[in-house]
């Protein structure tokens, strides 16, 4: 509607997650720390300063750790910000090979997703959300638009408004207070299986290609 495109000409085909995340080990209840993790590109659009501001608000939560895995244009700025604020419980890992990522996911009690408060960016659903769900992880976010819609529909976590550090901190406290956090992870995985699997993606894509008369080499689809 915003771009005067006929809705009948649009098909929603969300990204699926790599199969390597299907067997991520889940955290045991005996763990004494709460480990939150962001994994992915670290750029301006991701608004990770919101995470660091939330970490500052919650600095007295001594059992809380924030893990940031990835690289990007804002990484050095974030490291500097964390150092200036003396956020010793924020840990940066840099970029890691994709085949090592499941072991990092296994560390996390919940995954983080944040976006800048941009009305066009809010229309997107970052691929990390599907990956988080494939791994069976609860999600804590600070974003507007599609991300909170999915988190709410899946009943897999909590989401504050974009760039709202206080709201993100409150969402983290709600997660910590939830004695049934494991259920959030199970809900996350269940929603992934219902909406974001590779088979569903390929079947949907093939269906749409059939509608447009696409032909494979040597065969009609």
PLM features per residue range, with description:
Residues 167, 174, 180-195:
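A short, well-ordered alpha-helix in the C-terminal region of glycosyltransferases
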Residues 174, 198-221:
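C-terminal alpha-helical cap of glycosyltransferases
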Residues 34, 42-57, 76:
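A conserved mid-protein helix/loop that constitutes part of the nucleotide-sugar donor-binding site
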Residues 33, 62, 67-69, 76-103:
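Nucleotide-activated donor-binding/catalytic signature segment of Leloir-type glycosyltransferases, i.e.
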Residues 153-154, 158-165, 174-179:
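Conserved acidic donor-binding segment of nucleotide-sugar-dependent glycosyltransferases
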Residues 110-113, 131-142:
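Short hydrophobic beta-strand element within catalytic cores of glycosyltransferases
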């Amino acid at each position: 509607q915003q771009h005067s495109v006929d809705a009948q000409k649009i098909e929603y085909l969300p990204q699926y997650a790599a199969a390597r995340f299907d067997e991520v080990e889940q955290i045991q209840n005996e763990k004494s720390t709460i480990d939150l993790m962001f994994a992915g590109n670290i750029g301006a659009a991701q608004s990770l300063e919101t995470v660091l501001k939330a970490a500052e608000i919650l600095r007295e939560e001594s059992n809380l750790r924030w893990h940031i895995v990835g690289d990007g244009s804002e990484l050095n700025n974030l490291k500097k910000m964390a150092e200036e604020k003396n956020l010793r419980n924020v840990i940066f890992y840099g970029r890691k090979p994709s085949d090592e990522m499941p072991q990092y996911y296994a560390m996390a009690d919940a995954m983080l997703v944040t976006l800048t408060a941009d009305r066009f960016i809010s229309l997107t659903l970052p691929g990390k959300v599907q990956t988080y769900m494939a791994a069976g992880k609860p999600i804590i976010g600070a974003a507007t638009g599609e991300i909170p819609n999915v988190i709410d529909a899946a009943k897999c976590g909590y989401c504050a408004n974009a760039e709202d550090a206080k709201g993100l901190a409150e969402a983290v406290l709600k997660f910590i207070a939830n004695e049934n956090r494991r259920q959030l992870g199970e809900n996350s995985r269940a929603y992934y299986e219902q909406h974001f699997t590779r088979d569903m993606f390929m079947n949907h894509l093939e269906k749409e290609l059939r509608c447009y008369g696409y032909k494979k080499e040597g065969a009609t689809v």
